[in-house]
């Protein structure tokens, strides 16, 4: 069974469908590009950021992976600010909605992002990608070109905002033969102005209970991460003189899951599965918390169970599936059986009598509603 998936930079979304389970998701942003005359120890381009977290999926889930390119390749994919060989690095992210990388609904569905590094010219320092926030780029006077943050794009040198980063997008000086481009990210960094200038890095992001959710953000609490790590400049991998982004998903724990397709007052139909079906051990079902049957064979085939319920009562059906690690999945269903069956000529006294009967049923143990 496959437990690890790796994603390299390509110019489109990469889809993966994951079964329920506990996973570690990791993203590395791409390095910024550099051009001109470097110092003796090389260009001061911004490195890509690194972000990771652990996510438990309770249902089969489609995720879409977008991996940014080294800015030296001059690609604007996934938010890099274009400026020739001094283009910023593209962000790397995993999201719930696919389409073009700059699709607004897609950007608002990102659950983890690693920022791209800023591009630079000559000997001037660019900011690395985030991490919690992108690093700062500098020009020959030391003036800053800020990195993206959790709440806004990096602020550039010009007061008119023309070099500022924005949500999911870096920025660049309008003339590709001058200035430099910033890194893409959760929020992009600020671009460098004309002449020799290092741009800001894009910020990273990991969805948690306390993380910022912008207006229109769509992922819910079922996608909250635990054990989060966010490192600015955390991508130090160089392959063939390029440092593209990359992503990795690792299965940490296989889990059972259960889908109920139909149920009524006499029977229920359901299907059990598992990230690793060989780990399944048993299925149990309960009526009003009383165990009715334990199933230990053919666990992944669709099952229909039959039961008899008392009239004029409210009942609970609970189905529990267990694996060899004692991990469980369960469904609790509410079922009523002939509650208050009344004749056509019913009157208020009849209704009152039936309500008294239901109340008596609760007192004798019929306390669950399904």
Range-by-range predicted roles:
Residues 12-14, 21-23, 264-270:
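Structural beta-strand segments of beta-rich domains
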Residues 56-59, 306-314:
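Surface-exposed, short loops/turns at beta-strand junctions within beta-sandwich domains
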Residues 67, 321-323:
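Conserved structural position at the C-terminal beta-strand
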Residues 254-261:
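Proline-enriched interdomain boundary motifs that mark the N-terminal boundary
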Residues 271-279, 323:
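Extracellular acidic, Ser/Thr/Pro-rich low-complexity tracts
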Residues 327-339:
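Edge beta-strands of extracellular beta-sandwich domains
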């Amino acid at each position: 069974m496959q437990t690890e998936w790796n994603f390299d930079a390509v110019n489109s979304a990469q889809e993966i469908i994951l079964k329920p389970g506990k996973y570690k998701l990791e993203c590395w942003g791409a390095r910024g590009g550099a051009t001109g005359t470097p110092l003796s120890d090389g260009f001061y381009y911004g490195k890509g950021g690194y972000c990771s977290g652990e996510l438990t999926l309770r249902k089969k889930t489609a995720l879409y992976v977008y991996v940014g390119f080294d800015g030296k390749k001059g690609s604007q994919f996934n938010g890099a600010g274009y400026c020739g060989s001094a283009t910023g690095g593209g962000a790397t992210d995993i999201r719930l909605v696919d389409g073009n990388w700059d699709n607004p609904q897609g950007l608002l569905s990102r659950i983890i992002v690693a920022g791209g590094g800023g591009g630079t010219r000559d000997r001037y320092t660019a900011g690395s990608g985030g991490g919690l926030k992108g690093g700062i780029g500098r020009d020959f006077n030391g003036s800053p070109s800020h990195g993206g943050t959790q709440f806004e794009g990096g602020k550039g040198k010009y007061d008119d905002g023309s070099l500022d980063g924005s949500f999911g997008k870096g920025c660049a000086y309008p003339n590709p033969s001058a200035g430099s481009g910033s890194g893409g990210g959760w929020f992009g960094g600020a671009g460098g102005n004309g002449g020799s200038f290092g741009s800001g890095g894009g910020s990273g992001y990991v969805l948690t209970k306390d993380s910022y959710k912008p207006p229109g953000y769509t992922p819910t609490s079922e996608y909250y991460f635990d054990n989060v790590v966010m490192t600015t400049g955390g991508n130090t991998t160089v392959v063939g003189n390029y440092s593209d982004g990359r992503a990795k998903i690792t299965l940490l724990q296989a889990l059972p899951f259960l889908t109920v397709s139909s149920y009524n007052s006499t029977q229920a139909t359901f299907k059990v599965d598992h990230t690793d079906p060989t780990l399944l051990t048993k299925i149990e079902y309960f009526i009003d918390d009383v165990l009715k049957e334990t199933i230990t064979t053919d666990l992944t085939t669709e099952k229909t169970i039959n039961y008899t319920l008392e009239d004029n009562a409210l009942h609970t059906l609970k189905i529990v599936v267990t694996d060899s690690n004692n991990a469980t999945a369960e469904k609790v269903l509410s079922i009523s059986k002939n509650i208050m069956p009344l004749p056509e000529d019913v009157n208020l006294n009849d209704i009152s009598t039936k309500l008294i009967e239901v109340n008596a049923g609760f007192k004798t143990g019929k306390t669950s509603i399904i």
